[in-house]
Amino acid sequence: MRIKNGVWARKRHKKWLKLAKGYFGAKSKIFKQAHVAVMRSLRYAYIGRRLKKRDFRRLWITRINAAARQNGLSYSKFMNGLKKAGINLNRKVLADMAVNDQKAFAELVEIAKKQINAQ
């Protein structure tokens, strides 16, 4: 006796169509187009999760550089001074300080300047 895949095929199709909900036109209605669109969107999401890390690091460095230059020091010299002073703050925290707590950031810049001048 031949057993067809009707129930399971419908279940599989519904799963992909559910993931394609909100897509425009045939991409949310027709299984084949929905499957292709969802696979592409999942690929972009995967790539985006990796790009997000680079983008945020770049943003943090830009913010630190801008704040350090306002206090008379370049980014590379500032980071070098902090390293010599033994201050181990990551770029995320430094960028947050540069935006939200400029007084504390200015103190860090002064510490970095002293360490650079001491060498």
UniProtKB/Swiss-Prot annotation:
Membrane spanning residue stretches: none
Keyword rRNA-binding: yes
Gene Ontology CC annotation, any one: ribosome
Keywords carried by this UniProt record: Ribonucleoprotein, Ribosomal protein, RNA-binding, rRNA-binding
A single GO molecular function term of this UniProt record: rRNA binding
Domain of life from the UniProt record: Bacteria
Annotated GO biological process: ribosomal large subunit assembly; translation
UniProt xrefs under PANTHER family: 39S RIBOSOMAL PROTEIN L20
Family statement drawn from the similarity comment of this UniProt entry: Belongs to the bacterial ribosomal protein bL20 family.
Its job: Binds directly to 23S ribosomal RNA and is necessary for the in vitro assembly process of the 50S ribosomal subunit. It is not involved in the protein synthesizing functions of that subunit.
Name the record gives this protein: Large ribosomal subunit protein bL20
Protein's organism: Caldicellulosiruptor bescii (strain ATCC BAA-1888 / DSM 6725 / KCTC 15123 / Z-1320) (Anaerocellum thermophilum)
